Amino acid sequence: MAHEILIAETEAFLKNVAPETRTAIISAITGGKSACKSAAKLIKNEHLPLMSGEATTMHIVMRCLYPEIKPWKKASDMLNKATSSLKKSEGRDIRKQMKAAGDFLGVESMMKMRAFRDDQIMEMVEEVYDHPDDYTPDIRIGTITAWLRCKNKKSERYRSNVSESGRTALKIHEVRKASTAMNEIAGITGLGEEALSLQRQTESLAILCNHTFGSNIMRPHLEKAIKGVEGRVGEMGRMAMKWLVVIICFSITSQPASACNLKTCLKLFNNTDAVTVHCFNENQGYMLTLASLGLGIITMLYLLVKIIIELVNGFVLGRWERWCGDIKTTIMPEIDSMEKDIALSRERLDLGEDAPDETDNSPIPFSNDGIFEI
């Protein structure tokens, strides 16, 4: 039963794919372990005309069916990012509930009754993908079947609701406003080139959004690019604050210990009644300087500790390579796959309704114990 539902949901998920590709994937899934492994290898090597999201989804389905298929780094990275905001306690609870669910119906009812968020559903998928041997075939198949059903229902809802594209446009508008604000910060902190680069990327995103308005094909790329720009805005804001702290500390500590006398102070800074300036006496000047030196020392110690932590993370824990990969895929989100998806979507649009439906609608062969037969 679960196998048949899985095939039906897979066909529904692939209904925008070329008929021959859809037939090949369904035949591989129903054709046993060797056929599925061959298809997974073709998907991994990008030999099938699938978009990046379709390819990772199909690889997840095939590995959950047959754990002998090796995991794909691209799919693992996608799952890791989708569950990065999930708390560890939530992950433990989800794993316990999964093992108690039993089968597809149990998994689906668990998702519905608990009203799982997207990241919680993706945690379930990540578990059966990363650790398939820890779960029974019923749990694995039930999880990916319920996940595909959720994706298909969302897809139908998005097709009839253009407000999703409106939300995307609003997000890009917010990013554009943020990039304009970064120009103001750049004037203080010397981040002018970064701000201009960010603004150019935001304009490109706006153009891409206008071209794909109302379409779901490019939505994952748009969302990923928007998150990348938002991340850069946040990072530049943090850099600006650090620069300002350092500049303030050094500018204060560079002042002489004795403050200017009262006559000089009034002459330079108190020319009108509208301006009031507090002029420090010598003792107050010493205290201010000591406080500034203390603040500067604390700031330098903080920066030194941060540098040591970053060095430990990079050389000892080896996190720099992962961070570089995250930056590459988040700030500049998969340009090659984006271009490939754009070209593939144009081919599908050109093909239109004239594409013959060559899907094999013959009954799917199952043995008595529910295993696929060739």
Swiss-Prot record:
<keyword id="KW-1032">Host cell membrane</keyword>
<keyword id="KW-0812">Transmembrane</keyword>
<keyword id="KW-0449">Lipoprotein</keyword>
<keyword id="KW-0813">Transport</keyword>
<keyword id="KW-0472">Membrane</keyword>
<feature type="lipid moiety-binding region" description="S-palmitoyl cysteine; by host">
    <location>
        <position position="324"/>
    </location>
</feature>
<keyword id="KW-0407">Ion channel</keyword>
<dbReference type="GO" id="GO:0055036">
    <property type="term" value="C:virion membrane"/>
</dbReference>
<dbReference type="GO" id="GO:0015267">
    <property type="term" value="F:channel activity"/>
</dbReference>
<feature type="transmembrane region" description="Helical; Signal-anchor for type II membrane protein">
    <location>
        <begin position="239"/>
        <end position="259"/>
    </location>
</feature>
<keyword id="KW-0735">Signal-anchor</keyword>
<dbReference type="Pfam" id="PF03021">
    <property type="entry name" value="CM2"/>
</dbReference>
<keyword id="KW-0468">Viral matrix protein</keyword>
<keyword id="KW-1133">Transmembrane helix</keyword>
<feature type="topological domain" description="Extracellular">
    <location>
        <begin position="260"/>
        <end position="288"/>
    </location>
</feature>
<dbReference type="InterPro" id="IPR004267">
    <property type="entry name" value="CM2"/>
</dbReference>
<dbReference type="GO" id="GO:0020002">
    <property type="term" value="C:host cell plasma membrane"/>
</dbReference>
<dbReference type="GO" id="GO:0039660">
    <property type="term" value="F:structural constituent of virion"/>
</dbReference>
<keyword id="KW-0325">Glycoprotein</keyword>
<dbReference type="Pfam" id="PF03026">
    <property type="entry name" value="CM1"/>
</dbReference>
<keyword id="KW-0946">Virion</keyword>
<feature type="modified residue" description="Phosphoserine; by host">
    <location>
        <position position="337"/>
    </location>
</feature>
<dbReference type="GO" id="GO:0016020">
    <property type="term" value="C:membrane"/>
</dbReference>
<protein>
    <recommendedName>
        <fullName>Polyprotein p42</fullName>
    </recommendedName>
</protein>
<dbReference type="GO" id="GO:0034220">
    <property type="term" value="P:monoatomic ion transmembrane transport"/>
</dbReference>
<keyword id="KW-0564">Palmitate</keyword>
<feature type="topological domain" description="Cytoplasmic">
    <location>
        <begin position="310"/>
        <end position="374"/>
    </location>
</feature>
<keyword id="KW-0597">Phosphoprotein</keyword>
<keyword id="KW-1038">Host endoplasmic reticulum</keyword>
<feature type="glycosylation site" description="N-linked (GlcNAc...) asparagine; by host">
    <location>
        <position position="270"/>
    </location>
</feature>
<feature type="topological domain" description="Cytoplasmic">
    <location>
        <begin position="1"/>
        <end position="238"/>
    </location>
</feature>
<feature type="transmembrane region" description="Helical">
    <location>
        <begin position="289"/>
        <end position="309"/>
    </location>
</feature>
<comment type="function">
    <text>Ion channel, which might have a role in genome packaging and uncoating processes.</text>
</comment>
<keyword id="KW-1015">Disulfide bond</keyword>
<comment type="similarity">
    <text>Belongs to the influenza C protein M1 family.</text>
</comment>
<keyword id="KW-1182">Viral ion channel</keyword>
<feature type="site" description="Cleavage; by host signal peptidase">
    <location>
        <begin position="259"/>
        <end position="260"/>
    </location>
</feature>
<dbReference type="InterPro" id="IPR004271">
    <property type="entry name" value="CM1"/>
</dbReference>
<keyword id="KW-0406">Ion transport</keyword>
<dbReference type="GO" id="GO:0019028">
    <property type="term" value="C:viral capsid"/>
</dbReference>
<feature type="modified residue" description="Phosphoserine; by host">
    <location>
        <position position="362"/>
    </location>
</feature>
<dbReference type="GO" id="GO:0044167">
    <property type="term" value="C:host cell endoplasmic reticulum membrane"/>
</dbReference>
